[in-house]
Amino acid sequence: MLRFHFDIKDGGGIHRDEHGEMCTDHQAAEAEAVKIAVEMVRHGIGQWTHFDRAVEVRDESDEPFVRVRVVAKLETQRLK
């Protein structure tokens, strides 16, 4: 098992994950980043009309090796 850090990037900068999580390999860490991104949308899309966040995953080198970005727009149009 390897320790990976899942940093969150948003309009306010980067929120570093200092603790990290254990994953079996880089592919598993990338899959976890996708899950985190989906959860961010699920919990945040109703609070903003535009949602732009990214999860950057760092490995033991402390350098990001993958970024999962989510961009969503919430738009309501009253038709009647």
What role is predicted for each listed range?
Residues 46-80:
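C-terminal structural segments of small proteins and small subunits
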Residues 36-46:
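Short arginine-rich
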Residues 1-16:
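Short aromatic-glycine-(Arg/Gly/Cys) micro-motifs in beta-strand/loop hairpins
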Residues 16-24:
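A short, exposed loop/beta-hairpin motif centered on an aromatic-Gly-Thr core
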